[in-house]
Regions:
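Cysteine-nucleophile amide-bond enzymes
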Residues: 2-247
């Protein structure tokens, strides 16, 4: 007959084990709250409206790095907010044109940062048709070449064209040619995706130019500096401490 050996734990050791477990749980919860608490609060604080445009920085994308650097902007991606089957979603060109839960889009961004731009009151009558136009593009592939003249489509182009069609030809932001941007540091990457020379005359709508559209107002942002990178650098210089002269 086999015997079951029972190890008696000293009360002091049991006490230490319990407190160590409690401490580990508290450390985990504190770390979780530190990392995710602010963005969770921002998510619940933001009150979505149909047609809001969400801008963010994508942290692990080569093309996002090119877009932000070439345009001197914190934004490399955008999508339009709408309610689908009772849930807030973001219609976006991300790998392909699709709809993604708002929470998933927010938590996907660099530092969980995002900015919300809203159509001004006199333009809100165009929102429903703009969203319908966006949905007509569902399943179209993402355009890594940022060309506005093919069957593929990129994030800011999706919203720009949908609004332009809804408004009867009104531009949402200013088109710029690639040659007007700071493309030189990213020439190798551009040539790789282009499979040829840099198309300097190609006109594109960038996330920055879309955000600067006169039809939009910035209404909410979290953990993202909405200023151009050059403005941040200028501010940094303002706070530079000069070395002492030794007097």
């Amino acid at each position: 007959m086999s015997k079951i050996l029972r190890t008696r734990i000293d009360p002091k050791e049991r006490h230490i084990l319990i407190w160590a477990t409690v401490a580990s749980v508290l450390i985990f919860l504190t770390s979780f709250a530190w990392i995710y608490g602010p963005v969770a609060i921002a998510y619940w604080t933001y009150q979505p409206q149909e047609g809001d445009i969400l801008f963010q920085s994508l942290p692990k994308s080569i093309l996002a790095k090119v877009m932000e650097g070439a345009t001197d902007s914190p934004y490399s991606h955008c999508g339009i907010v709408t309610k689908i089957d009772g849930k807030w979603m973001v219609c976006e060109a991300y790998q392909k044109v699709t709809s993604t839960p708002l929470s998933e889009v927010i938590f996907r961004g660099k530092n969980y940062g995002f900015a919300i731009y809203r159509f001004k009151p006199d333009k809100q009558t165009l929102i429903d048709q703009t969203i319908r136009n966006v949905k007509e593009q569902f399943d179209k592939p993402y355009d890594v070449r940022f060309s506005m003249n093919n069957d593929e489509i990129y994030a800011s182009e999706l919203i720009y064209k949908a609004y332009r069609q809804a408004s009867g030809g009104e531009s949402l932001g200013k088109l710029v040619s690639l040659g007007q941007l700071r493309w030189e540091p990213y020439e190798e990457t551009i040539r790789y995706f282009e499979r040829g020379p840099v198309p300097l005359s190609r006109e594109i709508i960038t996330p920055r130019n879309l955000a600067e559209a006169e039809q939009l107002d910035l209404v909410f942002f979290h953990r993202i500096d909405t200023r151009p990178a050059s403005a941040k650098m200028a501010d940094a210089k303002t706070f530079t401490i000069e070395p002492s002269s030794g007097d």
